[in-house]
Amino acid sequence: MSLNQLQLSLQFARFAEAPVHRAVLSRSKVTRWIRHALAVDAEITVRIVDAEEGQQLNREYRQKDYATNVLTFDYQQEPTAMADLVLCAPVVEREAREQNKTLEEHYAHLLVHGTLHAQGWDHETSEQDAEEMEAYETEIMVELGFADPYAK
């Protein structure tokens, strides 16, 4: 399988638990996970933030006043995808615990999910789109050696 090129910027906001998340998110892992979800070459910034920054961005850009797991800001989809993926560390950590997943596994899934959004995939437009996106996410996660993220 030929993987597309990725220009990655990986950023960690300053917060108390940042070292834990930095240890899980090596540049090589993040690059591998994102590249498996790319259908085109890409320039992507991944930023790991605390709850305060996550909530502020979600409120400002989606008018939802809470921190969410991943926000995708896509600027261009072709010929090169350009996007920022913002992941809220406390939310990711809580969800991983609630779903009995490792932190690494949940980050991998959310990075795949956000990368698909950066290329125009959308699960909020219709049930069919949601099913197609979930099926593709599952296929990618299995290729990466992880379990089906939607398995009950």
UniProtKB/Swiss-Prot annotation:
InterPro entries: MetalPrtase_cat_dom_sf_prd, YbeY, YbeY_CS. GO terms for cellular component: cytoplasm. Zn(2+) binds at H113, H117, H123. Its cofactor is Zn(2+). Its main location: cytoplasm. The keyword Cell division does not apply. It is an enzyme of class 3 (hydrolase). Its EC number is 3.1.-.-. Keywords: Cytoplasm, Endonuclease, Hydrolase, Metal-binding, Nuclease, Ribosome biogenesis, rRNA processing, Zinc. It holds the Pfam family YbeY. It is found in: Cytoplasm. HAMAP family: Endoribonucl_YbeY. NCBIfam families: rRNA maturation RNase YbeY. This is Endoribonuclease YbeY. It comes from Delftia acidovorans (strain DSM 14801 / SPH-1). The lineage of its organism: Bacteria, Pseudomonadati, Pseudomonadota, Betaproteobacteria, Burkholderiales.
